Amino acid sequence: MYRVLLAPGAKQELRNAIAYIKRKLRNPIAVARLADEAKTTLRNLRSMPERHPFCDDPVLRLQGYRHAPVTKYQFIFRITKTPNQVRVLHFFHETQDYLVTLQMESPGP
């Protein structure tokens, strides 16, 4: 079993996505669906984080970044084995270029 840690930035990005759908799109069904699927995905990361693929970018792949889909969004995370942790770093919409953000944060291979 893995311990799932949601970074403050990822929490805020998830909150922002929910607020956008609620206030701008005025779609309570989509809000509930996103919240439910996000919770389910985070819960599933506790037992099977390796089932999610590595990011497509070769540099990010070498650094162990993976992504887990949540409706039209995705959690970006890394797995550590000692201790068994999943660190969820970001929550991006599918249209966002997450590569730029992650490469700027990345310490290198």
Would you name each region that the model predicts?
Residues 70-74, 78-109:
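Enriched for short, Lys/Arg-rich terminal
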Residues 1-64, 107-109:
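Basic, Lys/Arg-enriched alpha-helical interface segments
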